[in-house]
Design a protein with these regions (language model features):
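A conserved beta-strand-loop-helix scaffold within acyl/acetyltransferase catalytic domains
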Residues: 1-19, 23-176, 186-199, 203-204, ...
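Short beta-alpha connecting loops at secondary-structure transitions
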Residues: 181-185
Length: 248
């Protein structure tokens, strides 16, 4: 799942069916010659209040211990996911570049991990923070990381999925996609699909479609339920199962 257009025809030739499940947002730095992130309200407000962002290529042991404490607080007793996204693991964290946020009292209150895709593209994976932080802190971390990635010479940053965005909007769409379009429009009790799209639009320069592929002899519903079960075995706080199924 989360398959890009370049693989759709290949998988079709291998006997897979596929349905569109949303679009992934991309920030294209080549369109921004000047720094646009420091003008954002969340960036300015927390900076003025004394919050700091520090970027580590090699994480000190004492910092790792604090991040582990933050991660445990964020999980709130729930299990790590066992599929799709990274988990807080020493080996994983030690091989990742990490950005942290310190509050005015110099306490580490949140962190974000960098996820390189290739020499020109990157994304982020873990984004965790303490319970008592300002609402703007996650955005503060993302903006600072994007600023750092731009300085490093990356051209694009993937912002993750807008689940079900632009799915099943035409009369030629597959039945499964048309059903998902109804969920996108009216499924507010399941997940704030349209709100997520609007929030990501702030950073996004391009939207790129993503697909869910399943074997020809299987049904979309059965395959989707299998995927939900696989993800749900390790669900954690902050991301619903329905979001994780269609999230980058």
């Amino acid at each position: 799942y989360k398959i890009s257009e370049e693989y759709v025809l290949l998988l079709h030739d291998l006997g897979f069916h596929f349905d569109k499940i949303g679009e992934t947002g991309v920030t294209d730095f080549t369109r921004h010659k000047h720094d646009v992130f420091s003008d954002r309200f969340e960036f300015k407000r927390l900076t003025n209040e004394g919050y700091q962002f520090i970027y580590f290529e090699n994480l000190p042991e004492e910092v790792f211990e604090e991040l582990e404490e933050i991660s445990d607080e964020w999980l709130n007793g729930e299990k790590e996911k066992c599929f799709s996204v990274g988990r807080f693991d020493r080996g994983y964290i030690e091989t990742s570049n990490v950005g942290i946020a310190r509050d005015p009292q110099n306490r580490i209150v949140g962190f974000i991990t960098e996820q390189p895709i290739n020499k020109e593209k990157a994304s982020f994976d873990l984004l965790r923070f303490r319970n008592d932080v300002p609402n703007e802190l996650p955005t503060f971390l993302k903006l600072h990381l994007m600023d750092e990635l731009k300085r490093q010479g990356y051209c694009e940053v993937y912002q993750g999925m807008a689940p079900l965005a632009k799915v099943g909007e035409t009369s030629f769409a597959f039945l499964g996609e048309r059903i998902m379009n109804l969920i996108y429009k009216y499924g507010h009790s399941i997940y704030a699909f349209q709100q997520v799209t609007e929030e990501k639009t702030v950073y996004v320069d391009q939207w790129r479609p993503r697909y869910f592929a399943y074997m020809k002899d299987s049904s979309f519903l059965f395959s989707a339920l299998q995927l939900l079960y696989l993800i749900g075995r390790g669900k954690n706080k902050g991301v619903t199962i329905s979001e994780e199924m269609i999230e980058v």
